[in-house]
From Swiss-Prot:
<feature type="binding site">
    <location>
        <position position="31"/>
    </location>
    <ligand>
        <name>AMP</name>
    </ligand>
</feature>
<feature type="binding site">
    <location>
        <position position="130"/>
    </location>
    <ligand>
        <name>Zn(2+)</name>
    </ligand>
</feature>
<feature type="binding site">
    <location>
        <position position="36"/>
    </location>
    <ligand>
        <name>AMP</name>
    </ligand>
</feature>
<keyword id="KW-0545">Nucleotide biosynthesis</keyword>
<dbReference type="GO" id="GO:0044209">
    <property type="term" value="P:AMP salvage"/>
</dbReference>
<keyword id="KW-0067">ATP-binding</keyword>
<keyword id="KW-0862">Zinc</keyword>
<dbReference type="Pfam" id="PF00406">
    <property type="entry name" value="ADK"/>
</dbReference>
<feature type="binding site">
    <location>
        <begin position="10"/>
        <end position="15"/>
    </location>
    <ligand>
        <name>ATP</name>
    </ligand>
</feature>
<feature type="binding site">
    <location>
        <position position="127"/>
    </location>
    <ligand>
        <name>ATP</name>
    </ligand>
</feature>
<comment type="pathway">
    <text>Purine metabolism; AMP biosynthesis via salvage pathway; AMP from ADP: step 1/1.</text>
</comment>
<comment type="similarity">
    <text>Belongs to the adenylate kinase family.</text>
</comment>
<feature type="binding site">
    <location>
        <position position="133"/>
    </location>
    <ligand>
        <name>Zn(2+)</name>
    </ligand>
</feature>
<dbReference type="GO" id="GO:0004017">
    <property type="term" value="F:adenylate kinase activity"/>
</dbReference>
<dbReference type="GO" id="GO:0005737">
    <property type="term" value="C:cytoplasm"/>
</dbReference>
<feature type="region of interest" description="LID">
    <location>
        <begin position="126"/>
        <end position="163"/>
    </location>
</feature>
<feature type="binding site">
    <location>
        <position position="171"/>
    </location>
    <ligand>
        <name>AMP</name>
    </ligand>
</feature>
Length: 215
């Protein structure tokens, strides 16, 4: 089973990816992990990527695509895989499509965990973390017993910079602009599947399993 996982920041992709990987015994492949591995091992592609990153530049599609292609040819991918964070653009999706066609393979589905922007804002801006022990809370869904204090150690809990309204809105905006063409691309290929990401974690996973059973 070959799956591309799509969804906005705060949609719970990481949680669902882990569950899918465990249930179907396929590797969860994230572009972040691929980049870190190539860079830490000083592979030719890793060194090329680092040369761009050190200058504060975006790594070209060609480098990212070749890293992903190399990863998909490893032995643990023979029975399938779950791609998380790739493709990010239509050009990358087309490159993946071509790679699969050349191997007489095909993608089973592009799975979109759909969550409205207002819900993401509520979910992400309400997160709080303890300054001492790292305990996590949510002012709406998992509030501390004493306002502003950690249940575990009594230290202050704070909002991370990544979780401010301005930052979250910016991330959602970037996602929308980047991913909408990708969603249309997979729709046109009849490969797009959608689940409602506002449901409880277990219910979202149950819906995903039902969808994957239809592939």
């Amino acid at each position: 089973m070959k799956i591309v996982l799509l969804g906005p920041p705060g949609a719970g992709k990481g949680t669902q990816a882990k569950s899918i990987s465990n249930r179907y015994s396929i590797p969860h492949i994230s572009t972040g992990d691929i980049f870190r591995k190539n860079i830490s091992e000083n592979t030719p592609l890793g060194m090329e990527a680092r040369s761009y990153m050190d200058k504060g530049l975006l790594v070209p599609d060609e480098v990212t695509i070749n890293m992903v292609k190399d990863r998909l040819q490893e032995e643990d991918c023979l029975s399938g895989y779950l791609l998380d964070g790739f493709p990010r653009t239509v050009a990358q999706a087309e490159a993946l499509n071509e790679f699969l066609e050349n191997r007489n393979e095909q993608l089973d589905t592009a799975l979109l965990i759909d969550v409205p922007s207002e819900f993401i804002l509520d979910r992400m801006t309400g997160r709080r973390v303890c300054t001492s022990c790292g305990g996590s809370f949510h002012i709406k869904f998992n509030p501390p017993t004493i306002d502003g204090k950690c249940n575990l150690c009594g230290s202050d809990i704070v909002q991370r910079k990544d979780d401010t309204v301005e930052t979250v809105k910016e991330r959602i905006d970037v996602y929308d602009k980047q991913t909408q063409p990708l969603i249309e691309f997979y729709k046109s290929k009849n490969l797009l599947s959608m689940v409602d990401g506002t449901k409880a974690i277990d219910q979202v996973f149950e819906d995903i399993c039902k969808l994957l059973g239809e592939q």
